[in-house]
């Protein structure tokens, strides 16, 4: 191949070194790169993200970095993650500014079990964008948000904006019904001067307030609410309050910036189409029913700022396969992961003291669970119907096991109590109901007799073996 001009060899060498240095930095190596095969191999080995929503070919390992749409951006073994000196670059998307990952490098290094990390974004112009698709005969929505200040509503069709004024991020203010000239796709843009929250109502008049036909009960509210397909939250939004996106069945994508500090009861309850969520830094609790019945939710990354997972927070998230519970979490409440059929493994972090009633009930695919020493009580039906659970180690800190805690866990080969120095209280003879005939309850050899004679444990005397 002919060259248009001759390049000075010194310039070429300097350029090649610069390229090689950049490749080495991206690849996380200091090795010399042979030309051309070494360059090619190093470039192909660099993990790149899901900018533009492209399909990822990154292989899943232990520490997984996800984009907001669920694309796997980068993945590392635990050893590789411990060796990281910087976090991977964030993906790029038109109209969005990457705010970083919802776990810091320090917090990732402190966690010693598999985990998921999520990308945080804010809109590049600070406006909140609501992407809608209106059907024929359904072109007159009203919009409701909670301004503490003013919110300018640009309907995305070139008409004069509406302005909402309020004094609270939990009190809904409504626009008049807006008349679109034709059905189709529109982007509503909200410009906030002050602060803004989203709110709704799970009662008979309820559901998300964000897009409806009427502020009162009306069957047409469902039609407009379900025209919302994507939301990109901008600056000045601090609260996603009760039922904010309740039963927004068609909502499939949302970006939540790190300025949001509250996600409260029923916030995303019934968002059947949503597939991925990143909980940003600053959020401290996941409230009751927050993601209940999000049937398609396969990926969720929870910031390390979260300390509590409330009642039924993820109940009925049938597609959820993995979740990282941050080290700071001290409470996992009743039904938190009830009917998470696809969940395969869970680590209960140190700091949690009780696994509440039905917390992991009917997690049919759950094969392994790690329980921290801080746990003192396993409550009623905590692991009821966990058919696939293969074995479980009960740490010495557990002093009480409640009724039906491990009922119908047919596949468990052994329960390991070998680290215990005393016999924990067993509240009921139903605790291990359905135990397989060849299952073992492994206890210290010195405690076998005491264990077999203890209240309710005597029912399982034939399963108790000393180790």
Predicted segments with their positions:
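Short, low-complexity N-terminal tether/leader segments at secretion or assembly junctions of large
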Residues: 1-57, 71
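Extracellular interaction modules
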Residues: 31-41, 82, 103-122, 183-186, ...
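Extracellular ectodomain segments of secreted/surface proteins
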Residues: 51-58, 122-146, 193-233
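Conserved "repeat-terminator" motif of extracellular CCP/Sushi domains
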Residues: 55-67, 91, 107-125, 431
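Structural signature of tandem-repeat unit edges
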Residues: 68, 72-81, 106-109, 129-133, ...
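Surface-exposed interfaces of beta-sheet-rich extracellular modules
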Residues: 83-110, 195-199
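Residue-level recognition of secondary-structure-to-loop junctions
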Residues: 168-182, 186
């Amino acid at each position: 191949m002919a060259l248009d001009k001759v390049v000075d060899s010194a310039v070429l060498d300097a350029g090649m070194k610069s390229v090689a240095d950049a490749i080495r930095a991206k690849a996380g190596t200091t090795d010399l790169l042979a030309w051309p095969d070494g360059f090619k191999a190093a470039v192909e080995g660099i993990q790149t993200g899901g900018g533009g929503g492209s399909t990822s070919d990154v292989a899943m390992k232990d520490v997984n970095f996800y984009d907001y749409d669920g694309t796997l951006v980068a993945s590392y073994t635990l050893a590789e993650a411990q060796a990281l000196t910087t976090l991977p670059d964030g993906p790029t998307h038109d109209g969005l500014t990457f705010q970083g990952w919802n776990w810091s490098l320090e917090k990732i290094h402190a966690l010693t079990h598999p985990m998921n990390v999520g990308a945080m974004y804010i809109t590049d112009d600070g406006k909140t964008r609501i992407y809608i698709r209106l059907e024929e005969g359904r072109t007159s929505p009203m919009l409701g948000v909670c301004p503490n200040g003013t919110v300018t509503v640009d309907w995305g069709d070139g008409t004069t904006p509406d302005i909402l004024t309020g004094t609270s991020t939990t009190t809904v203010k409504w626009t008049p019904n807006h008349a679109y000239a034709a059905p189709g796709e529109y982007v509503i843009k909200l410009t906030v001067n002050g602060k803004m929250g989203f709110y709704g109502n799970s009662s008979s008049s309820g559901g998300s307030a964000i897009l409806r036909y009427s502020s009162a009960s009306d069957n047409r509210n469902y039609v407009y609410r379900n025209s919302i397909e994507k939301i990109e939250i901008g600056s000045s939004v601090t609260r996603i309050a009760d039922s904010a996106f309740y039963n927004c069945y068609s909502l499939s994508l949302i970006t939540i910036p790190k300025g949001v500090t509250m996600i409260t009861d029923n916030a995303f309850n019934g968002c059947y189409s949503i597939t991925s969520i990143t909980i940003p830094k600053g959020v401290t609790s996941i409230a009751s029913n927050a993601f209940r019945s999000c049937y398609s939710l396969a990926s969720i990354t929870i910031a390390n700022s979260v300390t509590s997972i409330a009642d039924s927070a993820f109940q009925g998230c049938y597609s959820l396969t993995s979740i990282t519970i941050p080290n700071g979490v001290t409470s996992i409440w009743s039904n938190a992961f009830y009917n998470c059929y696809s969940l395969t493994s869970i680590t209960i972090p140190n700091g949690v003291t009780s696994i509440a009633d039905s917390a992991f009930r009917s997690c049919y695919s759950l094969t392994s669970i790690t329980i921290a020493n801080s746990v003192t009580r396993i409550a009623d039906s905590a692991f009821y119907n966990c058919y696939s659970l293969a074995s479980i180690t009960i740490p010495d800190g557990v002093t009480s096991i409640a009724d039906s805690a491990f009922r119908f866990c047919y596949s468990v080969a052994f329960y390991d109590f070998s680290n215990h120095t005393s016999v924990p209280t067993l509240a009921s003879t139903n605790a291990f109901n359905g135990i397989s005939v060849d299952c073992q309850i492994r206890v210290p050899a010195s405690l076998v007799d005491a264990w077999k004679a203890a209240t309710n444990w005597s029912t399982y005397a034939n399963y108790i073996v000393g180790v």
